[in-house]
Amino acid sequence: MPEIDESRELLVVEGMITDQLETNRIRLTKSSSIDKKNLVKPVAGCIVSISDDLDNSWLLKESGNGNYITDSLNFRGVVGRKYTLRVNSNGKFPNNYTYESIPMELKPVPEIDNLYWERILIEAETEQRTAKEGCRILIDTHDDSNKCNYYRWDYTETWEIRLPYDVPNKICWTSNKSSQIIIKNTSLLSANSISRFLLNFVSDKTDRLEDKYSLLVNQYSLSEEEFIYWDKMQLMSEQTGTLYDITPSSVQGNIYCNENPSEKVLGYFSVSAKRTRRIFIEESFSGLVNLYINCPVDTIPPWQPIPYLGTSVWVIIDGSMDMPPYKILTDKKGCADCTVRGTTIRPTFWDDDKLNR
């Protein structure tokens, strides 16, 4: 969330609509001061609507935590139409201000030509250690019609977690949304073509490639004005870490206060067509970090009482039937229960890669 060096709270607007039949989300929060940068302040109770240039209007439903959503059955953006976001603060801000975006045209975006990965050698094998490998995920796209010159991508990673012990919650899945700003300008290129563009790098410092990994990428089209906005935001985020770290209030978005044009409003209302592609990686990579190497902390006979079992101590190996019998304990819950990092609910798409084989 953007952070500013002002005592007065300002409205922050984040969200977008697309041409897909899906739920679109607009999030409203209040800007935070320097000393409260980790405090997110959702704005509830506002009246949020979207209208187009044909005088159609849709009222968004409040879904909690500052989120306002469209009805996936009744709203779908149309390429070529212009959309305007309106926010009635409904008394949540002084003077009962209302806010409005500039009309935003929903621009087309080309299909994703290819999404693929490459194995990368991070450190070569030596007599003392095995090689360390990672993975680069790349994308190709082009637009012969030249209707899209400014691109933006985001993605969601999902990977399988398998504990090395036979415990009840052994297999889980977890997901992570991209936090970096990923954009590309082709307006100055001789051809509107993007080849081998790096989306993500998965290093050996994570276990994401240990079993099975998937990445879903979304491709969007931007106006030149929105590209300039994200380009400025990218420069700021490179200095501070990610999009969710400090963002100075000097980056002007496309939303304004009707009653007071000098009132500063943060964030951007994005409008774009969307194309998606998913990739699966189920290969063996050398030298990945072992997150479970320090799991065992004690070995006891099976008849010995275990104080705080299930609260601060867990059994990861039950060798009660072995000779001699034993149990191995850990003081790290994540070694005995994969739900510490994920969920046991299998993603509905997890076997989609096998359908094409």
Region annotations inferred by a language model:
Residues 1-357:
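A sequence/structural signal for flexible, mid-protein segments enriched
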